[in-house]
Amino acid sequence: MKALHFGAGNIGRGFIGKLLADAQAELTFADVNQTVLDLLNSRKSYQVHVVGEQARVEQVNNVSAVNSGSEEAVALIAEADIVTTAVGPQILAKIAGTIAKGLSKRHQQGNSQPLNIIACENMVRGTSQLKQHVFDVLPQEDQAWALQHVGFVDSAVDRIVPPAEAGSSDPLEVTVETFSEWIVDQTQFKGQPPAIAGMELTDNLMAFVERKLFTLNTGHAITAYLGQQAGLQTIRDAILDPKIRQVVKGAMEESGAVLIKRYGFDAAKHAAYIDKILSRFENPYLHDDVERVGRQPLRKLSAGDRLIKPLLGTLEYGLPHANLIQGIAAAMSYRSEQDPQAKELVELLAKLGPKAALAQISGLPAESEVVEQAVAVYNAMQK
């Protein structure tokens, strides 16, 4: 199995790339970081530190790397069996051109073997969005062929991969938690889905996408925002604070009530899933900074993301949402000199006031009760 993975960052190396390599794929990473590309090509291997109860170091071997925009990447797409990404939602549009060129070349070369493309991003149906970007630039004469031979497979991914410790001098070394989950939509494959240990197939992907978004992502973000408000440094420090933990767990229970109503999840199993996530946040071996986890507050406060989407579900089903409101107010309070969206958030709040700013960012009606509630909590937080 030939695999090309876009994104040689921590998630690419520590999660998706590792699973592909473990499945004996002939794996090439595509990235723009020349230092990482050169090191991967000279060493052909790297180490993954899995931390938790059963800490271990695992070696990933037989890897190579190319520049994301290069002709080599295009040529690899023409030959690959699977293409995956972990580049971040904003970058999908930037790699679409390379993928489109690769598909055109594949068509020209008469390669009618099925190719499956899987975007492994923190977003809902990311591969469907990547497909749209690819088809925007794919020549007309290749489109019908691509629809027939190329599967764009949506997925849900979950593994906490914090940035490397400052003390590590090796740019390729990566630290990951023991837990990982990669769930793919089996209805979207062309040909047989590849056998990759750790990749689970489902025909009800949205249930798992929303379960992860409404629980892990919602909880992680609220922990970060409340942690920053309390002057705490890491996710672990924040979740060990009883007041913060109460709100975070409460918010995950509120969003969980939506999931149980919408998808029929078992209530006891979902409660256990929430407890599992709380214990992941407590992992003493993961030094996950609240400022990093809180980054991009405008995206995280948008209508389809981890704070507003579960809130909309509570409104749809007439369910409580007091803790989600606390999380939204804390997100409005997020500040970071390093994050352009945090600066833009401050400007919007100053220019429009909290009510109009939240309405603009989230799509919620400015006069709605939930906006009034969130603004009241936000104002109280500023005192």
Curated annotation (Swiss-Prot):
Gene Ontology cellular-component terms listed: cytosol
Gene Ontology molecular function terms on file: mannitol-1-phosphate 5-dehydrogenase activity
Residue numbers binding NAD(+): A3, L4, H5, F6, G7, A8, G9, N10, I11, G12, R13, G14
InterPro entries (UniProt xref): 6-PGluconate_DH-like_C_sf (IPR008927), 6PGD_dom2 (IPR013328), Mannitol_1_phos_5_DH (IPR023028), Mannitol_DH (IPR000669), Mannitol_DH_C (IPR013118), Mannitol_DH_CS (IPR023027), Mannitol_DH_N (IPR013131), NAD(P)-bd_dom_sf (IPR036291)
EC number: 1.1.1.17
NCBIfam families referenced in this protein's UniProt entry, alphabetically: PRK02318.1-2, PRK02318.1-3, PRK02318.2-2, PRK02318.2-5
Protein name according to UniProt: Mannitol-1-phosphate 5-dehydrogenase
Gene name of the record: mtlD
